[in-house]
Amino acid sequence: MMRLAYLSLKWQAMGWLVLGRHAQALAAFDKLLQRWPDDAYGLSSRAHLHAQGGRFEQALADNERWVQVAADNAHAWFNRGYLLESLERYEEALASFVRATELAPKLDRAWYGQGLVLIRLKRYDEAVAALKRNTELQPMSPYGWYQLARVHVDRHNPEEAVKIIRHLRGFEPKVAAQLERETGLLIGTSTR
């Protein structure tokens, strides 16, 4: 009977989400978490809804509980890092992203998050290492490459930024052009 009640609330919430009715979905997750306060799915889902609504403190409260009940879940730590970064609590965010990569070394988003937070903390050498790992894991995603090029410019290492711009031209020419405009590094039309 308990399992049926749980599934009923979970499916209610999911149904409301499919219909785009976030307030009703949130109410269903509230009911679910009243009965099962340590439910990882309910905590993570409600945290996500709060974050979507810009309620980062509430999202963080749910995520903190999620981390407590699922301490070995890399995604819980990644989400915690994201929320802390959104709240400009960069040192705490960094610790969460690091924990996420310890638990799941191939979690590219956590490496990217680390890179962004390290940039905010002006720890550029460490940011380079994190962003390089992100680009190794996601070589065709322009986001890590873009940030890596920006860090190289900030570190007064334009030669490395130029290499990245050339690399990006091969699969993301618009991002390469944006970097050229933003950095003032005009590469020309050569792809070498």
Task: Say what each PLM segment does.
Residues 146-156, 175-192:
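TPR/TPR-like alpha-solenoid helical repeat scaffolds
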Residues 4-41, 45-54:
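Alpha-helical segment of the N-proximal tetratricopeptide repeat
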Residues 11, 45, 79, 113, ...:
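Canonical tetratricopeptide repeat
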Residues 19-31, 53-65, 86-99, 121-133, ...:
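Structural signature of tandem alpha-helical TPR/SEL1-like repeats
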Residues 5-6, 40-41, 74-75, 108-109, ...:
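Helix-start (N-cap) detector for alpha-helical repeat units in TPR-like alpha-solenoids
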Residues 35, 69, 103, 137, ...:
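Structural marker of alpha-solenoid helical repeat scaffolds
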